[in-house]
């Protein structure tokens, strides 16, 4: 009877060691990510204290948290914030129970009432009045009641992706070509490095077909989100941004 007990104690001891190592590893990873995230310049703004326009007549949804996500055409640290267009506009809805996330893009060239009955491209609302005006535009035109937002520029997006260890993204031949081209500019503007992806040889007959899945770093992922010259044009661009 003693042998089974010794074996059980040994297995329990091994499990305790494994759990301890996983815990230590988790703390290490958390520390590494936290240290990198601390390098991101985060500016918090309470929109509730500003003149954000809400739509009181819009249907009130319960059990969901909704955010407006803005990708800013802000490239240099010397440029003043809130004066640039938001070339990426995404509405993110999170199910509070299941944590499932649904993303809907608003095309940047959509003609909307951006401020005081002034109609222009949706991406210009941010330049007209910062996040307050951009969120108000969404509420006014789309019957929403959003009060929270996240805005991110090139530098922050590159840093966040690198903190996550990169992203695995399926790419077509055409996407590789355009992404490599964009990487040159993105790298220069952010000061971050990258390695160009080698083009498949031979060149596929269908340049729009997926050729493989590639691991992208921050510069590459940001450049991937900027692609708009494939056959699907801006529809394809917004789809890439939601991945």
Residue ranges and their predicted role:
Residues 102-129:
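Flexible, solvent-exposed short loops/turns enriched in glycine
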Residues 8-98:
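Entry/capping segment at the start of metal-dependent catalytic domains
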Residues 1-8:
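Terminal targeting segments of Actinobacterial cell-envelope proteins
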Residues 76-81, 120-128, 143-148, 211-212, ...:
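Second-shell loop/turn segments in exported
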Residues 70, 76, 109, 137-147, ...:
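Structured segments of extracytoplasmic/periplasmic soluble domains
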Residues 75-81, 100-103, 112-115, 234:
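Short, solvent-exposed loop/turn elements at domain surfaces
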Residues 62-65, 84-89, 98-106, 117, ...:
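Extracytoplasmic
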Residues 63, 162-243:
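Flexible, polar/acidic helix-loop-strand segments at domain edges
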């Amino acid at each position: 009877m003693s042998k089974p007990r010794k074996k059980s104690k040994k297995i329990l001891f091994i499990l305790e060691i494994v759990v301890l190592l996983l815990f230590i590893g988790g703390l290490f990873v958390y520390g590494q990510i936290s240290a990198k995230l601390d390098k991101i310049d985060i500016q918090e703004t309470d929109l509730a204290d500003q003149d954000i326009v809400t739509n009181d007549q819009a249907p009130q949804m319960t059990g969901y948290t909704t955010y407006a996500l803005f990708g800013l055409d802000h490239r240099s640290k010397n440029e003043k914030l809130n004066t640039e267009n938001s070339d990426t506009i995404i509405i993110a809805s999170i199910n509070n129970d299941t944590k499932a996330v649904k993303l809907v893009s608003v095309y940047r060239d959509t003609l909307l009432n951006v401020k005081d009955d002034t109609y222009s491209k949706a991406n210009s609302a941010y330049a007209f009045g910062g996040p307050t005006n951009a969120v108000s535009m969404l509420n006014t035109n789309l019957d929403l009641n959003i009060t929270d937002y996240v805005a991110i520029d090139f530098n922050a997006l590159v840093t966040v992706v690198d903190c996550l260890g990169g992203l695995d993204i399926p790419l077509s031949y055409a996407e590789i070509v355009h992404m490599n081209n964009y990487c040159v500019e993105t790298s220069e503007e952010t000061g971050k490095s990258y390695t160009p992806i080698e083009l498949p040889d031979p060149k596929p007959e269908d340049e729009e077909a997926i050729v493989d899945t590639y691991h992208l770093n921050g510069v590459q992922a940001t450049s991937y989100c900027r692609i708009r010259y494939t056959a699907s044009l801006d529809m394809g661009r917004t789809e890439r941004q939601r991945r």
